[in-house]
Design a protein with these regions (language model features):
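Structural core segment of the AMP-binding/adenylate-forming
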Residues: 107-151
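Aromatic/hydrophobic pocket-lining residues that form π-stacking "cages" and hydrophobic walls in ligand
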Residues: 31, 98-99, 148
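Short histidine/acidic/glycine/proline-rich micro-motifs that form metal-
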Residues: 17-18, 50, 138-141
Length: 151
C-alpha cells in the first residue's frame, strides 16, 4: 500500500502499532537482519576517482555487516564504551559509512564536517569530549588530515 499524503500515512500507521511490527530494535539488529536477508545485494558504493579505468568500490550487505562489526570491535578495543564519542572527519567514502555504523554500535558516532576550520573542529571535539577521532591519511587536494591534526 502506498501513500500520497499525510492522511494516507496515518491510515497505514493505524493498521499496526509500531511496537507490534517485527522490526529490529537496534542499529546492529537492523544491519544483521538485512545482511541475513540480502547477503549478496549491494549495500553501499563509492568511487573516489572518475578516470576511465577507475571503478567504484561496492560493499554487499554481508560485507558491510562484517566490516561494521570489525570497526565496532576496534573502537571497543580502544576503550570506547556506550557513552563515549567516536568523532570522525571524513569525506564521503565507504570507510565513512563503516566509521559511522561501527561508531554508533560501539558508542556514539559524531560526524564532523571536514570543511570546517581547525578551530571549529577543535571546539566540537572538546564539546563532545571525543574519545576517538577518525580521519584520513594525506590525500592530494585535501587538507582534512592537516585540519584534524591542527584541531
Amino acid at each position: 500500500m502506498g501513500f500520497a499524503n499525510l492522511e494516507d500515512l496515518l491510515a497505514i500507521e493505524k493498521e499496526i502499532k509500531w511496537e507490534d511490527r517485527d522490526l529490529p530494535s537496534t542499529l546492529f539488529g537492523l544491519l544483521s537482519r538485512t545482511a541475513n536477508s540480502f547477503p549478496n545485494r549491494p549495500a553501499v558504493s563509492y568511487q573516489i576517482l572518475s578516470g576511465p579505468k577507475d571503478k567504484a568500490e561496492t560493499l554487499t550487505w554481508s560485507e558491510l555487516q562484517t566490516k561494521t562489526v570489525q570497526a565496532a570491535n576496534m573502537f571497543r578495543s580502544l576503550g570506547v564504551g556506550s557513552e563515549d564519542v567516536v568523532a570522525y572527519i571524513l569525506p564521503n567514502a565507504n570507510e565513512t559509512v563503516l566509521t559511522l555504523l561501527g561508531g554508533a554500535i560501539a558508542g556514539i558516532a559524531n560526524p564532523i564536517n571536514p570543511l570546517l576550520d581547525p578551530e571549529q573542529i577543535g571546539a566540537i571535539l572538546r564539546e563532545t569530549n571525543a574519545k576517538v577521532v577518525v580521519t584520513m591519511k594525506a590525500f592530494p587536494k585535501s587538507d582534512v588530515p592537516q585540519k584534524a591534526a591542527k584541531a
